[in-house]
Amino acid sequence: MGGALQWNYSPQNTIIDTTGEIRWYMLPETIYSFDNIWYGGTMMGFRQEADGAMSWGYGQRYAKYDIMGREIFNRRLPTGYADFSHASKKIESNGHYLLRVASDGYKRPDNKIVRTVRDVVLEVDGDGNVVDDFRLFEILDPYRDNVLKAIDQGAVCLNIDPAKQGKTLTAEELAKQDQNDHFGDIVGSGAGRNWAHVNSVDYDETDDSIIISSRHQSAIIKIGRDKKVKWILGSHEGWKTPYQDKLLQPVDKNGKPIKCEGSKCEGDFDWTWTQHTGWKVRSELSKGDVIYISAFDNGDARGMEQPALPEMKYSRAVVYKVDQKKMTVEQVWEYGKERGHARYSPVTSLTEYYGDKDSSMVYSATAGAEFDWKTFSYTKFPSPVIDEFKWLAKEPSVEIILHGAEGYQAFPFDVKKAFHP
């Protein structure tokens, strides 16, 4: 029962230059078919690797091609795993890949057999053999429902349902899902539902750990090879034993603890809410016990609630400094709060640091969109925004606006590396 097999959108992948000119686009017909289970699915998780080629995944496959269309590999997911989406990460030290997938045929504690939803990180070697997996429904608490009850049911990643716009779930509705065997790509608690919605995975080579972003727990979480949680960057509400001693304590720039009540903290510090791309900042700053984390804070259910007016919502890019020994977190940079609802991007988006330029890229995927929920159509199409910031700068050095467009994520593409790796 369940799964996210129906998550299938025709791919539109393009490279543009800084003047807005299209320089390359993918012709996917030879590797993609909307009507074929094994060749359908939403293409996501694009990354340019050190050799200049791009890797990504879609549906029941993960692939790697160079910019001229030469296949390096295009493989089905191993048996027992299904429904790739959102994220892949190559471990440069050994050539392994981390793929965000799901478990196919998981037997729950109540003996119900389900296909889980966006809650497994699979590790495969360079030949596609299974090395390890992180079954998050066993590592985390799939019944922590604080965020699930607060998020807007009308917009969950790329799933948009006009009938549910502005609505939230109750504890009673969540409980009935188990009673009614209601499984699948739906917001809900427990394995077999979209309780985690992991949308990014990173690897920390210093301690052989993964870092995940869980949209539906509004948390960025580090997990060791032993499958034990190392720390949780997110609101402290709803976490039970044994997770309570893994929660990071907010501090100011002087190391003084910041007081939080519920999910709201004093001063400018804030957690991320339904965030994307919780990634390690790979620079000289991240060393020893200190690690910097960047994220795109989408901002739905901020403070574990819906605001009085939808126009009060905003998104932001944010960078945190985590002291893994002291178990503290300091917010060192944010951008977007001052732009207000005009830059609000409730779904997708990205924040990422690039060491070659010592800068951060921010992609606001659905900024500027206005939607008529009665006709289920845009009254104003999104205008995604690409910003580049010098490290911790208050204003962007570069800003590109894609008028009347849609796109899941974006990243800088190195043409020289593509042709001269």
Predicted stretch roles:
Residues 1-421:
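Histidine-/acidic-rich catalytic cores in large beta-rich domains
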